[in-house]
Amino acid sequence: IDPEGVLKNVPIKTYNHHLSHAAAGFQTSPYDDATVVVIDAIGEWDTISIWDAKYDRNGNACYTKLWGQKYPHSIGLMYSAFTKEVGLRPLDEEYILMGMAAYGQSHYKEAFKTVPLADEASITFRHNLHLGLPDEGKGGYGEDFDVAASAQELVESLIKIVIARA
């Protein structure tokens, strides 16, 4: 990358993935202090994080991580598993699944059986959803639009649990 060694003395700084999301949200907001919730598929190992964010008296943004959930327990990967279930590309076409949700009927209870939580309070899943939905409980949804509506309702209910924790 640097055959002539021009960059060898340039310091390299790394930043935590979820902290970067939190900073982008907080530092572009009009607030001086906030609770910031970050939810994604996987960033380094965190999948959910909750941060206390505020500016100190010198105007520097300060962050304290209050809670986090790690891979494989991931709302984002769960949504990707539903994306794969309807034939879309996981970790790429979730926006299509979200759009499809408006045209389907939610079968929330069936969706919840497919993706059982071991512990609701900590958003801990019984299965690693990185490779898709578990075989047991699959099917019975009907149209792909119904799968999308079920996934959307399930994700929204899980996000409410995370927000209540914050």
Where are these regions (language model features)?
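A residue-level signal for conserved active-site and pocket-lining positions in enzyme catalytic cores
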Residues: 22, 82, 159
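Conserved phosphate-binding catalytic cores of ATP/NTP-utilizing and phosphoryl-transfer enzymes
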Residues: 14-37
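Solvent-exposed alpha-helices and their adjacent loops that cap or buttress functional pockets
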Residues: 5-6, 27-31, 41-44
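Ligand-binding pockets and gating/stacking loops
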Residues: 19-24, 140, 148, 152
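Phosphate/ATP-binding catalytic cores across multiple sugar-kinase/actin-like superfamilies
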Residues: 149-166
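Conserved catalytic cysteine-centered active-site region
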Residues: 1-16
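A short helix-loop
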Residues: 38, 43-149, 165
